[in-house]
Amino acid sequence: MKETLIQLRHEMEKENVAALIIPTSDPHSTEYVCEHFAARKFVSGFTGSAGVLVVCKDCAALWTDGRYFLQAESQLAGSGIDLMKIGQAETPAIEDYIVDHCQAGETVAFDGRLITVNQADTYAEAFEAKQLHMMTDIDFVDRIWTDRPAMPDSQTFLYDVKYAGKSVADKLAEIQACMNKAEADHLILTKIDEIAWLLNLRAKDIPYYPVALAYMIVHREGGTLYINQARLDEESRACFEKNHIEMKDYEAIY
């Protein structure tokens, strides 16, 4: 892991970045992530399901909760990464740690797809004390992860309505009725479990979690599904077309 940190810091130095935040997350804020988004595990060697890694120029630390204290101590031993035990009085907040280890005017980076707006606001407020800048548009880990697993592409299938309880048409109609009541023209869905429910869509992108990585925009006449289209089975395609759901590539949401 020390060699990985050296490589990562080299990439950070190229962009004049003083600190890098690597959460355990994906663009959908999923609790358990697929291997493509397991960047924190790749860099730290810690395999627990929850944790945030911060890499600074001369130090690094990983925050995790009480479920993983013993595991993290073992897996981080000799890595050059300090363990920060969430909930302990002596454990600083992530943003406070960064402020303490950065000089005024330096830059803090993170993959903006993986951080919620609320968390970004918390960081921004704390960073004002030293006028730290935030960089959100570079995936630094991707630069050094030469054998990074590909995005999942498991075949999709429709969950039978006798188990789902309602058809896609019925669910869309209910949501559109709520949108009309709220005078909303569009509803953006980023949570993959919500999309799985709405479209009765299932896949095997994440172990033990039968979902597909996708985005969805619902409008008053139908919607748009953003997903790797090559993985859609014919039954799913026919269902979506029938319900006026356009299909576009996953990255097209941006």
Language model feature labels by segment:
Residues 1-254:
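Terminal domain-start leader segments
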